[in-house]
């Protein structure tokens, strides 16, 4: 029997580097460099000592801090023009149902808590193994349309993230109570806290207070103030009431320019497109070509991403033309950016079986499931599409569904259109800007 490599489906079961009960997939140098900047064992004094610490402050002492000239601009929200990452810290950029994401330097670091009772560590590697497998098997420029993780660490102890979150939450609670002259308490109402935090988070006075208290109380190079309300919703969600935030995976990605959903008309034109709709055609066409090329691979006509939507498509610089051949046509992309599919956590391909997707789907699906969902989310994200009658009418061919066979944009029934449906679709004049290098 031959040795499996990362071009084979069996790659997901290999354990190239073992550290105790943990495993590293990919480049150890990248992984160890990032890990060397994390303190996974940091802990803090009991919360009661934090409460006693804040008893030393009142509205008058906080006012003196607010009058100070010092301000750490990294404590503004990242969407604020005043935000600036003045330290080489981990900056929280997103928290979703399946991961907490940080940015550091030119990398993105994603922490994923895994329900170890449901899956073994090696059964949670799809986000690394599927894109790597596809990248190594695709032969043309279409491989550039995939985001591959640089490294992935399995079965790491991640309790520090939840502990850090609780420490920051307690700090914010006590700080806001002190600002309002209230009795100090670590009890809170989610609704009341979020309202108070959201009212203050953009205030320069509040940021000055954070500039003082975050280093003193938290003393960590992990900054979770940005989008803290998303982290709050994650950890405080009722479905995680009894969740054990014990172990999970750490995944390192290259840093993108934007996610596709962040592009508006102004940015689309800045990126070189004639209009926002032309930009949308661009990302649709590149994703369609990627799928078609994947389905051409042996045993890969079962590929599913299972979450194809604009915010799972990332934009990167493109320094040379991307040329993809399909039958007698040649699709040429001279744009300064490229789109790349990301977040393969629920994906499957060839012999790489993903138990997460297997448990979620009751009927058989193929590429059409993904594009049905993709078109729904495109139309929701970009109502401007309706202004282009030809394009919007064509897209409706993907969503001829009813409430009985579609729930929250996802197909509940099995519709297995052949990939030739998608091939014929992208040959239309809608995409003439890119066919045979016309652009």
From Swiss-Prot:
Pfam families linked to this entry: Pox_ser-thr_kin
EC number: 2.7.11.1
Top EC class of this enzyme: transferase
Keywords: ATP-binding, Host endoplasmic reticulum, Kinase, Late protein, Nucleotide-binding, Phosphoprotein, Serine/threonine-protein kinase, Transferase
PTM comment, free text: Phosphorylated in vivo. Autophosphorylated in vitro.
Catalysed reactions, semicolon-separated: L-seryl-[protein] + ATP = O-phospho-L-seryl-[protein] + ADP + H(+); L-threonyl-[protein] + ATP = O-phospho-L-threonyl-[protein] + ADP + H(+)
Cell location: Host endoplasmic reticulum; Host endoplasmic reticulum-Golgi intermediate compartment
GO molecular function: ATP binding; protein serine kinase activity; protein serine/threonine kinase activity
Signal peptide feature range: none
GO CC annotations on file: host cell endoplasmic reticulum; host cell endoplasmic reticulum-Golgi intermediate compartment
Binding site for ATP: 93-101, 117
Active site, per annotation: 307
Domain annotation Protein kinase: ranges: 87-439
Function, as annotated: Essential serine-protein kinase involved in the early stage of virion morphogenesis.
Family: Belongs to the protein kinase superfamily. Ser/Thr protein kinase family. Poxviruses subfamily.
Protein name, UniProt field: Serine/threonine-protein kinase 2
Species assigned in the record: Variola virus (isolate Human/India/Ind3/1967) (VARV)
